[in-house]
Curated annotation (Swiss-Prot):
It comes from the Archaea. This is Uncharacterized protein MJ0235. The lineage of its organism: Archaea, Methanobacteriati, Methanobacteriota, Methanomada group, Methanococci.
Amino acid sequence: MEKLIINSMKKVFLEELKDLENELNQIFKKYNVKSKDELKKKIANGEIKEEQIKDDLERIEFLEENIERVMKCLREINVKSL
């Protein structure tokens, strides 16, 4: 029974991770970049004005924090399943 619960939790976390990563990639695609660092370079070079994308930058931070939380949960689940 415990294995069933662990597998179910793992599935839910993997789906959540996929959704978070998809949303993050959509934001990156919007600015034709592949990472937050590339986006920051475009801001530094003046290609994009930070004020114009403030909401997206905040969303990127939120998504990255949640991706890390979900990955931490997945690591813990993987340890428990050993």
